[in-house]
């Protein structure tokens, strides 16, 4: 079964639209395009369902290699928080990440809404080399 499929079943049973569902297993958020077996989820496993608030939105982060990562965020999320989400997905430590939006480097202590970053905005991720400035 795909994760989308599981969300559709939850909608049938509970009436919760899939776009408001976040499924978590072993501390990881499950992505729609993947299957239960991709995450090694077996029978009798327990998934956690977290409801996404209406304020939730997706933003995109483009890396220098041209890869685009999709993140689920809230406007109130701090830049540190966004870097932690990138670390979860990509394994890049936050202290090596520099995030750029509209030509500005984003500061950890600020929030997405401070920078007027709205849904479907694209941030650019630049890696800071170890020992570099």
UniProtKB/Swiss-Prot annotation:
InterPro entries in the record: Ubiquitin-like_dom, Ubiquitin-like_domsf, Ubiquitin_CS, Ubiquitin_dom, Ubiquitin_ubiquitin-like
Domain Ubiquitin-like: 1-56, 57-132
Glycyl lysine isopeptide (Gly-Lys) (interchain with K-? in acceptor proteins) cross-link, chain position(s): 132
Gene Ontology cellular component terms for the protein in this record: cytoplasm; nucleus
Pfam family, one: ubiquitin
Family to which this protein belongs: Belongs to the ubiquitin family.
Protein name, per record: Polyubiquitin
Organism annotation: Strongylocentrotus purpuratus (Purple sea urchin)
């Amino acid at each position: 079964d795909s994760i989308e499929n599981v969300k559709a079943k939850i909608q049938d049973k509970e009436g919760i639209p899939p776009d408001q569902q976040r499924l978590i297993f072993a501390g990881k958020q499950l992505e729609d395009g993947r299957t239960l077996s991709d995450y090694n989820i077996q029978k009798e496993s327990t998934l956690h369902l977290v409801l996404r608030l209406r304020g939730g939105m997706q933003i995109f982060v483009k890396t220098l290699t041209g890869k685009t990562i999709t993140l689920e965020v809230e406007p109130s999320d701090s830049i540190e928080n966004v870097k932690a989400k990138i670390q979860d997905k990509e394994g890049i430590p936050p202290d090596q990440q520099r995030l750029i939006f509209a030509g500005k480097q984003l500061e950890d202590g600020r929030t997405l809404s401070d920078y007027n970053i709205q849904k479907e905005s694209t941030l650019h991720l630049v890696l800071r080399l170890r020992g570099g400035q």
